[in-house]
Amino acid sequence: MRTAEIGQRFVDFFESKGHTVVPSASLLYNDPTLLFVNAGMVPFKPYLMGTEPSPWKRATSIQKCVRTLDIDEVGKTTRHGTFFQMLGNFSFGDYFKNEAIQYAWELVTKPAEQGGLGFDPASIWVTVLGPGFHPDYPEGDIEAREAWRAAGIPDEQIQGRSLKDNYWHMGVPGPGGPCSEIYIDRGPAYGPDGGPEADEDRYLEIWNLVFETEDLSAVRAKDDFDIAGPLRSLNIDTGAGLERIAYLLQGVDNMYETDQVFPVIEKASEMSGKRYGARHDDDVRLRVVADHVRSGLMLMTDGVTPGNEARGYVLRRLLRRVVRAMRLLGVADPVLPELLSVSRDLMADSFPDVLTQWDRVIGAATAEEDTFRRTLSSGTAMLDAAVVETKASGSKTLSGEKAFQLHDTYGFPIDLTLEMAAEQGLEVDRNKFTALMAEQRARAKADSQAKKGLLTDREAYSQVRALGETPFLGYTDLTVDTTVTGIIANGTSVTAAEPGAVVEIVLAETPFYAEMGGQDSDSGIIRANGIDFEVLDVQRPVPGLIVHKVHLDGDLAVGDRVTALVNPATRFGACQAHTATHVIHAALRELVGPSATQAGSYNKPGYLRFDFSATKGLSDSLKDEIEERCNVAIHDDFEVTDTQMPLEDAKAMGAMAMFGEKYPPIVRVVELAGPWSRELCGGTHVASTGRIGMLSLLGEQSVGSGTRRVEALVSTDAFRHMAAERALVNELTGILKVQPDQLADRVSKLAADLKEAERKLGAARTRELLGQVDDIVAGTTPAGSFDLVAAKVPGVAGSDLRTLAAEIRARVKDRPAVVTLIGGTHDKPAMIVATTESARAAGAKAGALIKVGVAPIGGRGGGKDDMAQGAGSDPTGIDAALRAVNTELTAL
């Protein structure tokens, strides 16, 4: 039975039991506690936790998941993988334990020809919470045990286990409860008798049924938590691993040999000439390739692009591990296009998006592989040298400084350094590396992690949200008379606040737009008791709740009547910029191609930036064409309409959705000129495109592998920008005394003349430098067994200093000579040391000598054995620096 068919049987079965089939959420689910969806219940968390009402009483899904915690174990064992599909059925206050067990038993044991999974009932074992582990279940989960017994499982195949095995929670405060796990006995060839308690290789878990009964107030460990009380509704949350069921039903030994994975191994074997099963190390690499290719495909399909932070870094690591594994299998040519295309065809039946997003996926993957191949060439050489140096010193640990240099200078990820060092029998000083990375982040991104505007944590917001959601009336009204329903001060919900406090106000309804979907928040005032409080920020910290950050200039209490007034000028500017964002998105898709999908955006009055998927930059002519297309759309004054409709209907009509965003069952579709621009959007817009005025494209740049960014000004800001450019052209034509259409040619000629003058000046400077060579060589003095050519060359620095040192060394190449020059400026002396081949053979290393030489001038230096440079800040030590090199040479 194919994997896709198993999944379809699961959801079909539960649909027949009154469950709504919910499509898989994106792997980039909007949950700040997770990088990726890592469990089937994640999209249902708000409903299970009670923070949002569930749209369904019963639901079922096939959820794609990614977990990379054990990425280093992937391939080494056949149990670990980074991508998997979780089957689940859920009940939100509807049916409970008995029905959940009955449904599971029916599906698992029903013959395959009747639509079930067809497992032999005699092979099924189950576990339940055992006696003595939980105060509410002193005799264990008797209800679950009785339900399984009624289903037909003999007592000896029902095992009671501890909280660690048969109690489930999310690891944080929230719902929890006992669970029951279903196991399949694979037979004595896989391990000893005795059920799951004896051996979990022979007895393989396929399904976990969680019976959520309790609200946990604190969680310290799997079996250490505090119970606040019972849940308001009893929930069912189950998860069954699709890949695990598939390999049992397909008669293979592990998930790597199933129909959705093994063909990738076969393709990698074909490309490398390495037969799977012939050699352990090759098998490990082939499994790494198969797993990571599928994970990378699914992540890129859902909108992740390779990068250096968070999700992008995980994807980059997966793709680079594939490339390196294939190199170790002997394949030096590009590999990702072929491997990804195989995985795409395997996954298309289950997830059609892998086909519609293919152009963007393959573009990002190809660009990343090209980049990494260059990184491998440069970084591997440096790492090899560092390994040799470390071993020569007798150490077993590669320095954290070297690992950091590899990462910072060559883009070599630390995990690759760890992996390659381990292959050479070395550890890496990870603590030092981590400290250096922390220092760099602190310097580069101070305060960047602070959440804008929010004054407390999510828990406090969730408590206020439980009182009711905040209706947004701002699509039609900019002024609303309303009531204060909540005040949050210093992280706590309060009933009143005094003047001088900065608080967050919750209103019964609001016209203020909260920052969301790339659109900046509204500004304005909240008028209370005759006093105007300026609204500093508006946020939506948890779904359904809008908070208004204000500085109180008077008293305010819950229950006060207030008037909320949005600033109409800034709102109109935000509407112009947001509609212009839709215009530029449509223009990009029309002129660049359908793969130019949105990867992020930000807009505020007068300005917008838009990130989109692309593997190369836009030409100047294409940028001009895009700007013109946008302004034609503005001139055509297309009507802007919005319509509420079911999410599935919106997708069916081609409405563009932002990857990773969570959308409710009913969505708002904003259209410009019908199908030309049709997007899911909750933002505010002008009534027609003509009200944008105009758009001026500022520029375009890369913001990460596979992602480009355009920036633009709109309305009066665009007019001012163009007026400033016109004034600049007028000024330049006046200075250069040419007509505007002659300006480019005139500037080009001036640039060419300047380049030629610089070339001549450089040639003259080189002749002058080389004219000193004879005099400097004539001043050669002995230093032990070496000839020391030392001189001061004031004003000579950088490449000129290197050129002079190299020329002098060439003159004395037949001798064991060391060239030492000090130049630079008066307050910043620069030093260089160069050695001949025979000098190096006798023990004179430029890299070691420079460290001795720069000390007297208060500097630092480094380099290779043949040439090294340094610089300092103390010119009084120049003579001492030259003497120090002489002394060091004499001692060799």
From Swiss-Prot:
One of its GO terms (molecular function) is ATP binding. Zn(2+) binds at H578, H582, C681, H685. Its EC number is 6.1.1.7. GO terms for biological process: alanyl-tRNA aminoacylation. GO terms for cellular component: cytosol. InterPro entries: aa-tRNA-synth_II/BPL/LPL, Ala-tRNA-lgiase_IIc, Ala-tRNA-ligase_IIc_anticod-bd, Ala-tRNA-synth_IIc_core, Ala-tRNA-synth_IIc_N, Ala-tRNA_ligase, Ala_tRNA_ligase_euk/bac, DHHA1_dom. Binds 1 zinc ion per subunit. Belongs to the class-II aminoacyl-tRNA synthetase family. This is Alanine--tRNA ligase. The lineage of its organism: Bacteria, Bacillati, Actinomycetota, Actinomycetes, Propionibacteriales. The gene is alaS.
